Amino acid sequence: MDRRENDQSLSAGTIEGLKMTANGFYEEIVIAGFGGQGIMLAGKLLAQTAMNAGKEVTYMPSYGAEVRGGTANCMVVIAENEIACPVVGQPDSLIVMNKASLHKFGPRLKKGGLLIMNSSLIDETPEVDNSIEVIAVPADELAVELGNKKTANMVVLGAYLQKRGHLQIETAAQALPETIAERYHETLPVNIKALKRGAEFVSHFSCV
């Protein structure tokens, strides 16, 4: 399996809300926001985490005009067996960091899916099917509390991992050095804290 960092397709557990096929567990995820929010990093980390956990994975980032000032997004597919197509039309899970991303991808989310949104920048009730579970995470505020607003992407990813339960936070933390460029390794501790903070938030959210 080719695991080069710049490869646009990186291919490499009961899980709440995930679909089970004849070939086992299979989930399609879209992560979206605007350029500068670390959308691609979150997608790469999710893909690397799943790969390190022995899953099959594809990762497809969206580059080009959309990334600058508009909606940046990436598609991640995680499965127990070979993935036929890396393109995600209707995601099982959607992580959105801003309103534009919610408006663009919200209508595509499958019934019974999971929506995690950054309520720091999304102050509206999403117009999605009633079967979809919506979790609003004040990611920017939580990241600021940790001392680095740029870790909001890790907060929402931690929330997703905790909610779905198919991958462990510790596995994601261990995958960070492989995902973040070495010159930014001084940020590893705060990024790990952000992953855990997002997970803690969802744990509390589920209990209220």
Describe the function of each predicted region.
Residues 2-208:
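Active-site cofactor/cluster-binding pocket
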